[in-house]
């Protein structure tokens, strides 16, 4: 019973409800009087869950006591602004005050921690899918007789897919009747099943198509994961939690090549996808039982739906349902699907950070082209040793998160305490740490032949900058556009994934054309480094002009 109470909006419990095995509610209705002031009195009952006996003998004789056993909770909305609106609406379903345990913000710490861990795990598994392929690329090229650029399509199209997916999926998660959970579970289930197709692909064209589709399907976890964390974590701690989530987002694609290399050495490239399939199955099992719906609008929608079902009265509604019902479906779809692009084009803040993050993300995936040149071509590392060379990024994640903690405690927390915190406070982190990215690119390029440890050290600096710029920008965007955070992240995901998909395609050609015998990756890395220096001015500009830009935004009202 305790499990059903704490995880009632999980996929497993949803199935139990659909099959009428359990009936779920919060508090029951004692008396409903729609005359006069439309008053409603409610009482509580010790049990919140009731199992159906399967018998329907007394189903035709429901009384008030029967309704009491259905455990419904109805909260009354009251507008005190005008005398005419003082009457209560018994059909408006809301949270039962700010301390309502049904509200995601008020869930227990243990429950929130479990959701955070599962969100990180889901993100890790999906991000692994991008780079776990790279150790097997040469084998795939040889088996299907394709060149390097064509072989790289399996990486690029996967990354492009999870940039395109959020344009459709992220707005859907903002619809109260859908929410986050169905989008997560349906897409991840299909993603898991298609790994079997990748492992058994008979030709290269089929593999490329499946990789693109799986990239699209994995996108909800990557783009909406931050919104899920924002559903349950207050703004005071959101930056820290997003930092933890981002560790998984960075660590997964850099650890995946080591796992992929192990599979290639032990078996062959097809076992890369079998390994990913098994990881997905384990994750899917955990999410089925312990990952609940987190969107507050959808939690209320589910509450209202249960009341409608148990009372047989379809007049119960939520404010969000009423808003969505009044908007024509065609217009609603246009707005939700068009909004990420609209905000990217019309909002200078969104556009600026989309460009900055896209370049950083593209530079990150450029390392997957540079590593074989440096560690394979210069130092003759084996396939597994090349996978180990990515550990510099993991070390960088640890130091980067420490910097984030220090900033949050020493700067952000103090400004929260004395009420001087503004969205621009988060930009201080990006302003102070942005120099690490160009330094890392220059260091990686010009010290590649000095000693193998120096390029690995440059990975640490790259993550120090990239990680904290991501945290600063995502926190800033989330605070500036709280109502449309999923759409903002969807547009950002499209921008950065487009860059990340393109960089591996021209990466090797760029290094070959710009490189010299003594400096094979120097000028190529430096070219990207110069662009990162130019975009480093963005947080400085927004720190000064951000408030005025936000005041003019129609999405910030």
UniProtKB/Swiss-Prot annotation:
Disruption phenotype: Leads to increased sensitivity to benomyl, diamide, and menadione, but not 4-nitroquinoline-N-oxide, cycloheximide, or fluconazole. Increases the intracellular accumulation of 5-flucytosine and clotrimazole. Belongs to the major facilitator superfamily. One of its GO terms (cellular component) is plasma membrane. Residues 44-67 are annotated as: Disordered. Glycans are attached at residues 33, 48, 106, 418. This is Multidrug transporter FLR1. Gene3D superfamilies: MFS general substrate transporter like domains (1.20.1250.20). One of its GO terms (molecular function) is fluconazole transmembrane transporter activity. The keyword Membrane applies. Pfam families: MFS_1. Residues 44-57 have a biased composition (Low complexity). PANTHER family: FLUCONAZOLE RESISTANCE PROTEIN 1, MAJOR FACILITATOR SUPERFAMILY. Multidrug transporter that confers resistance to 5-flucytosine (5-FC) and clotrimazole. Also confers resistance to benomyl, but not 4-nitroquinoline-N-oxide, cycloheximide, or fluconazole. Plays direct roles in extrusion of 5-flucytosine and clotrimazole. Induction: Expression is induced by benomyl via positive regulation by the transcription factors AP1 and PDR1. The promoter contains the YAP1 response element (YRE) 5'-TTAC/GTAA-3' which is recognized by AP1. GO terms for biological process: xenobiotic detoxification by transmembrane export across the plasma membrane. The lineage of its organism: Eukaryota, Fungi, Dikarya, Ascomycota, Saccharomycotina. It comes from Candida glabrata (strain ATCC 2001 / BCRC 20586 / JCM 3761 / NBRC 0622 / NRRL Y-65 / CBS 138) (Yeast). The keyword Membrane applies. InterPro entries: MFS, MFS_dom, MFS_trans_sf, Multidrug-R. PROSITE patterns: MFS (PS50850).
